[in-house]
Amino acid sequence: QGPGRQPDFQRCGQQLRNISPPQRCPSLRQAVQLTHQQQGQVGPQQVRQMYRVASNIPST
């Protein structure tokens, strides 16, 4: 929950940039599920943040 969590999302966004757009949604879903498994629970806030990071990725 602390400010130290932010780099995780940025690193996640960095990795998502390397994924071609067709694979991006499944990969994002997988990332959400993985985070859910690791932390036990992912709140709506974290999910929103993940999607916000992902939606800021330019499609190239």
UniProtKB/Swiss-Prot annotation:
SUPFAM superfamilies in the record: Bifunctional inhibitor/lipid-transfer protein/seed storage 2S albumin
Stored InterPro entries: Bifun_inhib/LTP/seed_sf
Residue stretches of biased makeup (Polar residues): 12-21
List of residues that carry Pyrrolidone carboxylic acid: 1
Keyword terms, alphabetized: Pyrrolidone carboxylic acid
Ranges where the record places region Disordered: 1-21
Function: Is used as flocculent to purify water. The flocculation activity may be explained by the patch charge mechanism, due to the high charge density and the low MW of MO2.
Protein name listed in UniProt: Flocculent-active proteins MO2.1 and MO2.2
Species of provenance: Moringa oleifera (Horseradish tree)
Source taxonomy: Eukaryota, Viridiplantae, Streptophyta, Embryophyta, Tracheophyta
